[in-house]
Amino acid sequence: MQYSTLAGQTDNSLVSNNFGFLRLPLNFMPYESHADWVITGVPYDMAVSGRSGARFGPEAIRRASVNLAWEHRRFPWTFDVRERLNIIDCGDLVFSFGDSRDFVEKMEAHAGKLLSFGKRCLSLGGDHFITLPLLRAHARYFGKLALIHFDAHTDTYDNGSEYDHGTMFYTAPKEGLIDPSRSVQIGIRTEHSKKLPFTVLSAPKVNEDSVEETVRKIKETVGNMPVYLTFDIDCLDPSFAPGTGTPVCGGLSSDRALKILRGLTDLDIVGMDVVEVAPSYDQSDITALAGATIALEMLYLQGAKKD
């Protein structure tokens, strides 16, 4: 049996590194590969404030992606993304479970090394805190970023905790990783501070506006900056994604979210993640399927640039 040794440790997990996204064979040598995009599972959920279990998200998303692998041309796209992009799955990040500091160091180092070798990162969480070390790695490589953030929560809360999945986008502007005035948060429907100049597109507004209007606002906000795209699955209404740690009623439908994503093809998206899938609360794997579909849609955004 082959084991992942990402970050120099041997992975003996029973729930990770079994098979790849879209049935891709696992590639445990991602840095030396010829990949355009590298998928990494991030089984971390020690920063949650509600229900835990997102550490099982990568495995659930990969398992659900089997249902998507058969379709050569993902509807409504007109090409097979696997023919346009060299995509590999390098398995799950290996870190000392229970040690958040070690996780942050390993996550940032792994993403930074991939970028230095000319790869791009699609990360499967895991709770939303994983985005902070990913932003650090990407900002070091690309400079200050614009953020496109799908979520029910702004995650701009200042509670003094170093490791919390609700504080990343308070910390990231302070560290100079993102420009909040060029960043947009979509699907928000919880109380939040207005001290930071994020463009907030609330769930009621997004559901009321046309998809074209929402896409226009996103593009107008981020402009031509390098973009990091993060999708918290609780952006979707719980009827479409019950399997998550902090579900909030009144969210987006999966159809609307996918249509918005498809409108972002001409943006300079340099890194992406899908987070907060917690399969123990799921029903019939619909949340995992939503996460897998969104991840695949993100890859199609990149493939569309090859036109």
Curated annotation (Swiss-Prot):
Its EC number is 3.5.3.11. The keyword Protein transport does not apply. This is Agmatinase. One of its GO terms (biological process) is spermidine biosynthetic process. One of its GO terms (molecular function) is agmatinase activity. It comes from Neisseria gonorrhoeae (strain ATCC 700825 / FA 1090). InterPro entries: Agmatinase (IPR023694), Agmatinase-rel (IPR005925), Ureohydrolase (IPR006035), Ureohydrolase_dom_sf (IPR023696), Ureohydrolase_Mn_BS (IPR020855). HAMAP family: SpeB (MF_01418). Its cofactor is Mn(2+). It comes from the Bacteria.
